Amino acid sequence: DIEFDEKFDYITLIGVLEYQGKYTDSQNPYIDFLKKIKGLLKEDGKLLIAIENKYGLKYWCGAPEDHTGVPFDGMNQYCLGQKAAQTFSREELNEIVKESGFSDTYFYYPMPDYKLPTVIYSEKYLPKNEVDSNIMFYSYPDNTTLIADESSIYHDVIKNHVFEFFANSFLVECSLKKDQGERVIYAVNSNERQKELECIT
């Protein structure tokens, strides 16, 4: 463990939390890890967690699980392959964060996922009818496991108000205190335009 002389305004865990069960003997590795992180934050500091959603729509369509490469592995509790990591649903992740001592959480939904997002929705700004046309969905070198086209299903997911459950990944802002002021509710990176017209809003 590294000792720090000062506490931090922000700490980011980008693709980190899911591996904590692999490198510790703790009975509650994810909660214990976040408690340590919490102790490194200033009183008004924030923790940002980026992680895959084990129930992400791409996985229901047959895309390989990001950590094991085995389709449907995460939603099957990794019983089909070697458990290299542990991902969570929105409800599970929120519960872990709250049990770790964080008072406030705010969920963002990077699309197509947190690794290469072109659009970021939030719990205060969800897609209304269709997902944004700026979203660049992944193509897979080996598409033999795919059983459906992810991009064509989102309309029905949105219509039935289950987008937050099926979002491919989460970006979670965690705070020690409530009422953190104004938040960004929607962001888009328009990088498919001519270079002089590219922008982020």
Where do the model's predicted regions map?
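A short glycine-rich, Lys/Arg-flanked "PGG" loop and its adjoining helix->strand segment in the class I
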Residues: 26-48
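Conserved class I S-adenosyl-L-methionine
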Residues: 46-73
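Short alpha-helix
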Residues: 82-109
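Short "lid" loop at the C-terminus of a central beta-strand within the Rossmann-like core
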Residues: 18, 52-57, 109-114
